[in-house]
Amino acid sequence: MANLLRVLMVAEKPSIALSIASVLSHGQMSTRRGSTEVHEFDGMFRGFKAHYRVTSVIGHVFSVDFPEKYQNWATIDPQDLFDAPIIKKESNPKAHICRHLSNEARGCSYMVLWLDCDREGENICFEVIESTGFDMKDSKRKVYRARFSSVTEKDISKAMDNLVEPNRDEALAVDARQEIDLKVGVAFSRFQTSYFQGKYQNLDCRVISYGPCQTPTLGFCVQRYMHINTFKPEKFWALRPYIRKDGYELQLEWERRRLFDLEAATVFQKLVVEGRTAKVMDVSEKQEVKGRPAGLNTVNLLKVASSALGFGPQTAMHLAERLYTQGFISYPRTESTAYPSSFDFTDTLRAQVSNPVWGGYVQRLLSDGFHMPKSGTDAGDHPPITPMRAATEVMVGGDAWRLYQYVCQHFLGTVSPNCKYIRTKVELSIGGETFHCTGQRVTEKGFTAIMPWSAVDEKKLPSFLKGERIEVLRVELYEGNTAPPDYLTESELISLMEKHGIGTDASIAVHINNIGERNYVQVQSGRKMVPTALGITLIRGYQCIDPDLCLPDIRSFIEQQITLVAKGQADHSHVVQHVIQQFRRKFSYFVQQIEHMDALFEAQFSPLADSGRALSKCGKCLRYMKHITAVPPRLFCGTCEEVYYLPQKGTVKLYKELTCPLDNFELVIYSVPGPEGKSFPLCPYCYNSPPFEGIDTLFGASKTPNAPAKTKTGAGMPCSLCPHPTCQHSVRNQGVCACPECEGTLVLDPVSFPKWKLNCNLCSCIVLLPEGAHRITTTSNRCPECDSAIIEIDFNKKTTPLENGATLHQGCVLCDELLLSLVEVKHGRSFVRRGGRGRGRGRGRGRGGRRGSKSVDPKMSFRDF
């Protein structure tokens, strides 16, 4: 291998790396583990013997963010974010992708990039180049780009034979979009969230976000809601005469359709009734054609998935990406509906002959001759979404199978004949008024044979002769009301986004998903997008202050500018600077006029001062704070006008009127119901503003069960994480031993009587203690073998396991034979004694301290805890 060229190849996902390596090595490769797997084999590269390493990233290597100094909501004015620098940091630091790429690139003379062939993929190309130390200008270490639309052997081999250079302009277009979306979105979101947090009781204000794409998307939903809400129905009347012909009773359609004047409609009804017979004025037959579909692009796939299959856009894209990485369909992100001239339809059809559902149909297409698809739009990116190899439901799974089935049927429809049918129209005259009836008869099913949902509805008509007269059976005067449109469906919303240039084929699903996750809309039956009170109020607020903020025009303009960057027709930095300047001015005006939006919020939501019940005392003013139970649950001090967020999905009660030694706030006890639910005390102030540095770094407080969202108030720190030495509820005084499952500490649940238990302060592990004991407490003594806290149990005299009816016992839950036999571990591994020491990897031994009784600085960094 010493004399071989070394070639590094990087794909976007591990599964694609495996497919590429399998094809190019003909299955003769070795695989070793790394941050992502590395497949190695020998082969030829550009006429020379080479040793290949094929590995992958897992999406974007880097994400954009603000430097640390701009992360503090309390000290940074959102206005400053427009001028703030941005940094790129590893998207997934724990995966160590940068280090992995750097290591694998050592000694390699060439690198071939197999990232997805869209703008995002092009951007990742340059992230990989940066991580590996390759340089586009270095002639000794060459970088190539493989362009492919599927992970089939044919496409991979073709891409390998036609390597190109990465497109920096497309990568810069993504950089521009990321910077614009970050600065605009975060500035508006921080200001809105900070302004409205703590003002209203029934407002879910954890994050009130704004997004240049997200907000216009919401705007479409609210616009339809407003149309429905302001719609005023009108009565109308229509004539409906009935005739009988050859045993068929037919209702005739009035040429005037309907009238909004009852008196006029009544006059026409009288004329028709007096006419008595209908005279056939004309009988016409016309050959009609329903054209086969063009190729399937992403937007149309998402629309069909929502309207016909019941999948949301996000789910549909996940399924499509999975089918793509497994090699069943071509790349699912494309704007094109036109196939390239080089597309091999015959091979693609042959791959489907074996399918038990439509294999026979495919065989007939090949035997009789298939039709070339009708011309569509060539966006210059990827071919339409196409099946690449045969699959069965067992191979791909239920939901993925339904999506795959549609992709196959759509493709087969594009190469099938058109649907042909004869449309018959009969015009009749009654009392001087013209009516008609129509019928349809299919002569050639064409593509509708494989796409039955697109079939023409057949309607049989009896035969009519021009000039014949037919008796009128009756004439109804139908009364109806005009109806408002329904709520937007996901499919209709996708169409509007595409029409107005909101998002791309790669991001439309994300924007729709976001407005649902933010509780701005709810997806109801029929995949209808119904805006919530919060979503409606937000859009109405933008409309009052600056309608541009929720209209699609600005985002459409931004997308156009970004496209110019991608084509090399505009400078990346100039576009970013121009757009940021526009939004900076709009932000300043928005801040000045925020009272207009607040007035709408006040009309819709209840002020905190008028809500909730008194629960615990504020440590600052010593007045009672009100408990707001609406999501997100919180305490509100009307005197200090401060809000303190509480854990969710549980109950909160006052805890024996005890106070925190750090800030004098009254403690509350949080409990999760159920036999395996947890309880822990917390100080409202400490929970929102942890007083010890590094609490979130050490314990991942943002991941603590039921911790509040990351806002300017900080992450959640209950007493079970607090190391304060003098607080009787802290982990130092209530912690017993290390958790057997994680790096946490098992803490005595203070209100678990009579079903006593220890709860891990980080994970879901629970240790059940002897049930029915009168009292269980921790002591200041430690186990000499494992340094865990000694607990004291006062057993019930009727059920005591102690000899001679004794009830009081002290011991270590890990080392005491009696206690070890009485405890049970839930959601974790059992304690195992090894050399006299209990099992567990928790930080700190026993109650979180090191051996000995050193005093602990309450301002410590937690690094030594």
Swiss-Prot record:
Residues 833-865 are annotated as: Disordered. Residues 6-151 form the Toprim domain. Residues 167-587 form the Topo IA-type catalytic domain. It comes from the Eukaryota. PROSITE patterns: TOPO_IA_1 (PS00396), TOPO_IA_2 (PS52039), TOPRIM (PS50880). Mg(2+) 2 binds at residues 116, 118. Its cofactor is Mg(2+). Its EC number is 5.6.2.1. It holds the Pfam family Toprim. GO terms for molecular function: DNA binding; DNA topoisomerase type I (single strand cut, ATP-independent) activity; metal ion binding; mRNA binding. Residues 854-865 have a biased composition (Basic and acidic residues). Mg(2+) 1 binds at residues 12, 116. Keywords: DNA-binding, Isomerase, Magnesium, Metal-binding, Topoisomerase. The keyword Metal-binding applies. GO terms for biological process: DNA topological change. Residues 209-214 are annotated as: Interaction with DNA. It catalyses: ATP-independent breakage of single-stranded DNA, followed by passage and rejoining. This is DNA topoisomerase 3-beta.
